[in-house]
Amino acid sequence: MPRSPSKTSPRKGSPRRGSPSRKASPKRGGKGAKRAGKGGRRRNVVRRRRRRRESYGIYIYKVLKQVHPDTGISSRGMSVMNSFVNDIFGRIAGEASRLTRANRRSTISSREIQTAVRLLLPGELAKHAVSEGTKAVTKYTTSR
């Protein structure tokens, strides 16, 4: 017997039986579905924490605001500055390490850092860097 047209055509807005529905029904198996034979317990989902990316960004921004309060910096500019600081840090640390080994010592002191800065940076820039570094170390030791 042929079926009536109302039985074969689905109602407006509802999906056909057997075809996948757009909304995931709680009865069907999915990521959050209960497993049969487990006593109705749900498995604890362990969420991975996002790894923290270390950056000098906040410090670069603070220095920028001290020097030019009305100036901003783009994320690309911040990335360049961060790379620059990491590069200089690595160079100074490497040079200070070589100086420490050359003097047969096991600890990098402020003196090695100062000498490394003098060796790496040219002329006036080295003088200003040493004076600012000395000022920062003095401020730190007096605040302790």
UniProtKB/Swiss-Prot annotation:
Residues of this chain annotated as glycosylated in UniProt: 131
GO MF annotation, one: structural constituent of chromatin
GO cellular component, one term: nucleosome
Positions of transmembrane segments: none
Localization: Nucleus; Chromosome
Motif (SPKK motif 3): 14-17
Family: Belongs to the histone H2B family.
Protein name (record): Histone H2B.2, sperm
Lineage: Eukaryota, Metazoa, Echinodermata, Eleutherozoa, Echinozoa
